[in-house]
């Protein structure tokens, strides 16, 4: 595993087409932006695990 240290506003490039930028840090939470081609799937880990398990996202419609 490659471990890098970045400051807000700095980026990491993966290959020629993917850029990860540190947008902000607040406490233990880090906001990142990911710029990738549309044919590259980008998911949070918990969403990816649900996809792999064949589960769908919870219904976000409100009930009266």
From Swiss-Prot:
Xref: NCBIfam families: csrA, PRK01712.1
Name of the protein in its database record: Translational regulator CsrA1
Up-regulation conditions: Expressed at low levels during exponential growth, considerably more protein expressed in stationary phase (at protein level). Positively controlled by GacA and negatively regulated by CsrA1 and CsrA2.
Keywords: Activator, Cytoplasm, Repressor, RNA-binding, Translation regulation
Consequence the record notes for mutating residue 44 to A: Partial loss of repression of hcnA in vivo, decreased affinity for mRNA
Role played: A translational regulator that binds mRNA to regulate translation initiation and/or mRNA stability. Post-transcriptionally represses the expression of genes controlled by GacA/GacS. Binds the 5' UTR of mRNA; the mRNA binds to the outside edge to each monomer and each dimer could bind the same mRNA twice. Recognizes a (A/U)CANGGANG(U/A) consensus, binds to GGA (part of the Shine-Dalgarno sequence) in the 5' UTR loop, which prevents ribosome binding. Overexpression represses target protein expression; mutating nucleotides in the 5' UTR abolishes repression in vivo.
This protein's domain notes: Residues in the N-terminus (2-4) and C-terminus (37-44) help recognize the GGA loop in a mRNA stem-loop; recognition mostly occurs via the protein main chain carbonyl oxygens and amides. Similar interactions occur with fragments of sRNA RsmZ; the binding affinity for GGA-containing RsmZ fragments can vary from 10 nM to 3 mM depending on the sequence and structural context.
Subcellular location: Cytoplasm
UniProt GO BP: mRNA catabolic process; negative regulation of translational initiation; positive regulation of translational initiation; regulation of carbohydrate metabolic process
GO molecular function, a single term: mRNA 5'-UTR binding
Organism encoding this protein: Pseudomonas protegens (strain DSM 19095 / LMG 27888 / CFBP 6595 / CHA0)
Example of a GO cellular component annotation carried by this entry: cytosol
